[in-house]
Structures are given as structure tokens and as C-alpha cells.
Amino acid sequence: MNLLINGLALLTVLLAMLFFLIFLGLFALYIANKKAFPKRMLITFASCVALFLALMVYNQYFFTFDRIDKAHTQQVARPVESPNGAFTAEAFYEFYGGVLGGVNVIVEVTDNKNVETKIIYYAEAKAFVSLVWRDDETLAIYNEDYNRNPNDEVVLNVSNEIYHDRGLACQSVLLRKKFKTCYEDNK
């Protein structure tokens, strides 16, 4: 879905640039020869710009994790069950961009009682990923580089907190309703 929206946005920008160049040519003719003002071309260009802006707003403020392609994920380690057995946490790698791309890490928590699964952590993957339950509802996620920086730990209450390193989940109107607190990387 995200690829479709980004492709449509790119096509819209290219069309807007083409229409803008045509508009500039017609506007130059209007100035030089007093031809009719190119209203239709101006309206077409403005429509392309409006469509592009609408797609960008949709992409930014209506973000969901449904856009993750599960076919391109790989489980990092075995699932880790909470001390009371109410939740199970799993970490996955999401590969993107082919040879020149990268890897994101996703932590998904399943409520074993209601059999509901939700993503609570999404970030650029580093060298080591591990999950440790602190108590029945608190999960520590270590996404560490080779230097073992102590700031690479994120502790979340799995019931109502979420982390997205780029902040898209924090800006999303749809995800804000599901989570009480949202964290993002402030680097």
C-alpha cells in the first residue's frame, strides 16, 4: 500500500512539473501575444499540486503498520512469553530496498487471552536485538550496536505504549487512539 501511495505521489509530482512547464509556456504567449489566459492549464497544475499534498498528508497522518509486507520479514529469535503468560513478544527483521536497502526491526506483542496482535516497536535494526520482560506488562527491547550503548534500550508497557524511531506512529491519527503514550528517537 505504501509503495502504491509513494508511486502515485511521484507520478503526481512529475505531472505537476510537466503541467507547470506547459503553463509557463502558455503564460509567456499570453504576455507576449495577448493570447487567452491559460486557465485550464493553471487549474490542472493546481489540481496536481493539491493531489500531491493530499497524498503526503495521508501518508504522514494516517500511518498504520498494515503497510508492512509480512512476506519480507524474518523472525529474529524465539517468541518470549511474559512472566504470567498473558503476552508473547516476537521480534522480526523487515528487509527493504533490495541490495542497497536496509533492515528494520519490528516487535509484535500478542495478547494470549484475546488473541490480538499489535506492533509496539519499529526502528532501524542494529547489530543485536533482544527482548526481556521486566514484569507482566513491561517489555525491555534492546536494539544495540556493536558498542553496546546503554541508550539503545526501550522499555514499554505493552498495553498502552508504542515506539517508532521516526515518529510516524506518534503522528498517526489512527494509532494515537490505540496507544496512551508514543515514543520516538530524539537523535
What is the predicted function of each stretch?
Residues 1-32:
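Membrane-embedded alpha-helical segments of integral membrane proteins
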Residues 55-115:
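N-terminal export/targeting and maturation segments
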Residues 150-187:
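C-terminal partner/receptor-binding element of secreted or periplasmic proteins
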Residues 40-62:
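Internal/C-terminal transmembrane anchor helices
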Residues 123-127:
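Short coil/turn segments at the loop-to-beta-strand junctions that recur within blades
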Residues 31-42:
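Membrane-interface helix-boundary motifs at transmembrane edges
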Residues 80-85, 130-138:
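Blade-terminus and WD-like Trp-Asp/Gly-His loop motifs, strongest in beta-propeller folds
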Residues 117-121:
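A short beta-strand motif characteristic of beta-propeller blades
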